[in-house]
């Protein structure tokens, strides 16, 4: 609806140029998990809708984000990696203590956690435009994760313990009573405003689709399934990044398990309400 057609090929150069033409400056992986169980979090317990050990490990890593060419302010305690594609930076603080403002259509504005995820680096690299060996365009990319409410309480408690994990861990699944996972990508910079596109999967939909899942685990499993099927169909492809896999083939496989796939424009900016 901006008068530009997406590339037919998987050539990353074409996708990078499209992102540049759309004036995309920032990309958030914007996720809000509202699932709630009857039994609330207890003291010295970490509660989550997916792997507790995985979330703790990711949250304690230094916050990493793809670093855009439009950025003018160097963050305090930031550094560059001494290896790799040089599309990202890191902050000398845990992602679980790094808050970022973001937006999803149903939640609206929120403060999430800048949790390290590999796609923040690979997407910023994938969408890099170079001219004569010099980087002329690259968006800032990072996660903006607002986990379920009991997981937020768990993070606060762990921070107070000087980042020592609780002795008890509980993954809520069969005891989830309500809520959904709203997981998508927020594009920022286009003159039309922000645009979010992603999956809205309720706990009721997840249980109807595949037993022994909650909304979060099924969204993850759908992507894993699609990747495995693609690998079986392409045995000679070698090692590939997720961004280089045919997205149409992946969505065809994963689509039945993702609930409502939808996109929405908004007029939100990170400066709203901060005057």
Predicted region positions:
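C-terminal catalytic/substrate-binding lobe primarily of soluble NAD(P)-dependent oxidoreductases
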Residues: 3-275
């Amino acid at each position: 609806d901006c008068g530009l057609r997406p590339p037919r090929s998987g050539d990353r150069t074409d996708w990078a140029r499209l992102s540049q033409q759309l004036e995309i400056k920032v990309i958030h992986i914007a996720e809000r998990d509202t699932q709630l169980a009857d039994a609330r979090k207890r003291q010295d317990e970490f509660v989550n809708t997916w792997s507790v050990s995985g979330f703790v490990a990711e949250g304690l890593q230094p916050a990493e984000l793809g670093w855009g060419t439009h950025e003018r302010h160097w963050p305090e305690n930031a550094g560059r990696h001494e290896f790799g594609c040089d599309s990202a930076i890191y902050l000398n603080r845990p992602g679980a203590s790094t808050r970022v403002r973001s937006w999803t259509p149903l939640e609206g504005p929120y403060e999430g956690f800048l949790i390290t995820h590999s796609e923040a680096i690979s997407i910023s690299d994938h969408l890099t435009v170079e001219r004569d060996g010099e980087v002329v365009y690259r968006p800032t990319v990072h996660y903006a994760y607002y986990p379920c409410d009991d997981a937020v309480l768990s993070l606060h408690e762990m921070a107070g313990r000087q980042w020592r994990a609780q002795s008890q861990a509980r993954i809520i699944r069969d005891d989830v009573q309500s809520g959904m996972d709203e997981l998508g990508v927020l594009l920022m910079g286009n003159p039309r405003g922000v645009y979010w596109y992603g999956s809205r999967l309720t706990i009721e939909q997840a249980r109807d689709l595949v037993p022994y899942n909650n909304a979060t685990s099924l969204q993850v499993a759908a992507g894993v399934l699609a990747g495995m099927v693609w690998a079986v169909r392409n045995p000679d492809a070698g090692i590939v990044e997720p961004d280089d896999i045919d997205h149409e083939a992946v969505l065809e496989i994963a689509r039945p398990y993702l609930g409502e796939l939808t996109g929405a424009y908004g007029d939100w900016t990170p400066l709203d309400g901060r005057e």
